[in-house]
């Protein structure tokens, strides 16, 4: 049944726009150029407002997810990478449940990727319709059918651009993937802005700067009591403070430290005697994939809950899923969950709220650890990184594990890879929870994604440098 399903959608995949694989080896300088162009297009789309919207001043229902989903409210990048990640989540769950079986052949892999792209486009249309019909840009009846359709078309075209930009990098024209690049850019932009933002905010304590570092100098310059000013700069509420910034730097350091944890399996050439090497299995075997998929799951749950709350507020089942409240304290207006399932799956705002509602914290910890471990373990089966896939790759390279025959390699790799995937996912979830509880800027999930993505780019740079021989030859 599984292969039949992929065969059914094969004709639809054939008509989808596709980036062709490069016919020659792309030089590092060209990859940097294409990556920069991709990032430039994305940033431009983040600044172009949607034409036809009546209002976007209401409380932002997806404020908490925007940093992670690389989206920007009221612009062409309203949906961000959400459709791509959601389609990946759905396809992974279907493959993990054996509803869809992905074969080992390149044809099956290509068909699976095509199906993922098709679902991504369908989800883009679905999310665009939901955003418009729930009144995010104004009352649909007042805007009229023509304007509503125009907004949906704009969001669909922007979603298609994101899909193609991601595919451009994935096919080897650029560095890394579009999803990773957009997420890291958005998160780093948020951290820098909240540290150095010159925007002023009127609070009960008077006019203050949003940026934590600028606020420090402003408070020390304007307050007569310097000790109190220093305390306020470190611990002020509802705006970024220095403790948030220190927590962010601390989490960066911890994640980089954990990146070095790995097990090196000794391998040797089956053709040439005396040629030895190692195959590294990292603690973060699936990298940031678990946290991206977990974010997609929560993001879509938020969308459904918000949509139902708007239409059926007061319904018992809707309230069980999530109840929402608006706030504009210390920043832009935003909606946040105050009850129901969405509340318990959202991170506590600070360590103080953990002590106030420990049940919320415990449920959140269990959900984060469990979901990240689950997604990490199932991802290896559909991404070509399971023990069977690794053994096949080593065999193709005519390499075998020292002390093991070819037939026993899969069994030996199975001792390490599934464990590394599950435990690595567990650690990713744990680090994200720690960052949330410490109050790191950009959310624990965001910080974790930023660090792992930046580290991936560092590894790409080191790999390219080792192939060329020097940094000068690499860039010039």
From Swiss-Prot:
Membrane-spanning residues: 34-53, 77-96, 118-138, 145-165, 173-193, 241-261, 289-309, 355-375, 421-441, 446-462
Entry keyword Transport: yes
GO CC terms: Sec61 translocon complex
Any GO BP annotation: post-translational protein targeting to membrane, translocation
InterPro entries reported for this sequence: SecY/SEC61-alpha, SecY_CS, SecY_dom_sf, Translocon_Sec61/SecY_plug_dom
Sequence ranges on the Cytoplasmic membrane side: 2-33, 97-117, 166-172, 262-288, 376-420, 463-476
One Pfam family in the UniProt entry: SecY
Keywords: Endoplasmic reticulum, Membrane, Protein transport, Translocation, Transmembrane, Transmembrane helix, Transport
Subcellular compartments: Endoplasmic reticulum membrane
Keyword Protein biosynthesis applies: no
Lumenal side: 54-76, 139-144, 194-240, 310-354, 442-445
Disulfide linkage: none
Principal subcellular localisation of the protein: endoplasmic reticulum
Taxonomic superkingdom: Eukaryota
Topological type in the membrane: Multi-pass membrane protein
Molecular-function annotations in GO: protein transmembrane transporter activity; ribosome binding; signal sequence binding
PANTHER family to which the protein is assigned, alphabetical: SECY/SEC61-ALPHA FAMILY MEMBER
Complexes and interactors: The SEC61 channel-forming translocon complex consists of channel-forming core components SEC61A1, SEC61B and SEC61G and different auxiliary components such as SEC62 and SEC63.
Purpose of the protein: Component of SEC61 channel-forming translocon complex that mediates transport of signal peptide-containing precursor polypeptides across the endoplasmic reticulum (ER). Forms a ribosome receptor and a gated pore in the ER membrane, both functions required for cotranslational translocation of nascent polypeptides.
NCBIfam families associated with the record: 3a0501s007, PRK08568.1-5
Family: Belongs to the SecY/SEC61-alpha family.
Protein name per the record: Protein transport protein Sec61 subunit alpha-like 2
Record lineage: Eukaryota, Metazoa, Chordata, Craniata, Vertebrata
């Amino acid at each position: 049944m599984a292969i039949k399903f992929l065969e059914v959608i094969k004709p639809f995949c054939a008509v989808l726009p596709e980036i062709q694989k490069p016919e020659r080896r792309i030089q590092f300088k060209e990859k940097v150029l294409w990556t920069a162009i991709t990032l430039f297009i994305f940033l431009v789309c983040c600044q172009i407002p949607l034409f036809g919207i009546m209002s976007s001043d209401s409380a932002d229902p997806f404020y908490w997810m925007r940093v992670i989903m690389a989206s920007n409210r009221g612009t062409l990048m309203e949906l961000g990478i959400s459709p791509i990640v959601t389609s990946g989540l759905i396809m992974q769950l279907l493959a993990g449940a054996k509803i869809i079986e992905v074969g080992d052949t390149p044809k099956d892999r290509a068909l699976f990727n095509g199906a993922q792209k098709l679902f991504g486009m369908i989800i883009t249309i679905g999310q665009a319709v939901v955003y418009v019909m729930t009144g995010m840009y104004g009352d649909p009846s007042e805007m009229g059918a023509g304007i509503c359709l125009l907004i949906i078309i704009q969001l669909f075209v922007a979603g298609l651009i994101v899909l193609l930009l991601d595919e451009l990098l994935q096919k080897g024209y650029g560095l890394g993937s579009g999803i990773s690049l957009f997420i890291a850019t958005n998160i780093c932009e948020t951290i820098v802005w909240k540290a150095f933002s010159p925007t002023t905010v009127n609070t009960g304590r008077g006019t203050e700067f949003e940026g934590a570092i600028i606020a420090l100098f402003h408070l020390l310059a304007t307050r007569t009591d310097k000790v109190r000013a220093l305390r306020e700069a470190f611990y002020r509420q509802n705006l970024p403070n220095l403790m948030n910034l220190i927590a962010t730097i601390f989490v960066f350091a911890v994640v980089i430290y954990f990146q070095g944890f790995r097990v090196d399996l000794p391998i040797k050439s089956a053709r040439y005697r005396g040629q030895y090497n190692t195959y590294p299995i990292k603690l973060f075997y699936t990298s940031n994939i678990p946290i991206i998929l977990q974010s997609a799951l929560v993001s879509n749950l938020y969308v459904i809950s918000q949509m139902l709350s708007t239409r059926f507020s007061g319904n018992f089942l809707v309230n069980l899923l999530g109840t929402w409240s608006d706030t504009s304290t210390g920043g832009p207006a935003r909606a946040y969950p105050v009850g129901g399932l969405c509340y318990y799956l959202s991170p506590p705002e600070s360590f103080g709220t953990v002590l106030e509602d420990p049940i919320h914290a415990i449920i959140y910890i269990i959900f984060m650890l469990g979901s990240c471990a689950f997604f990490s373990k199932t991802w290896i089966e559909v991404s070509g990184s399971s023990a069977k896939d690794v053994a096949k790759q080593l065999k193709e390279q005519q390499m075998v594990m020292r002390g093991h025959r070819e037939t026993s390699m899969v069994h030996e790799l199975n001792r390490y890879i599934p464990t590394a995937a599950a435990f690595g996912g567990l650690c990713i979830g744990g680090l994200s929870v720690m960052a949330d509880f410490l109050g790191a800027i950009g959310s624990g999930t965001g910080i974790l994604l930023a660090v792992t993505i930046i580290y991936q780019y560092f590894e790409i740079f080191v790999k390219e440098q080792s192939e060329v021989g020097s940094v000068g030859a690499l860039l010039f």
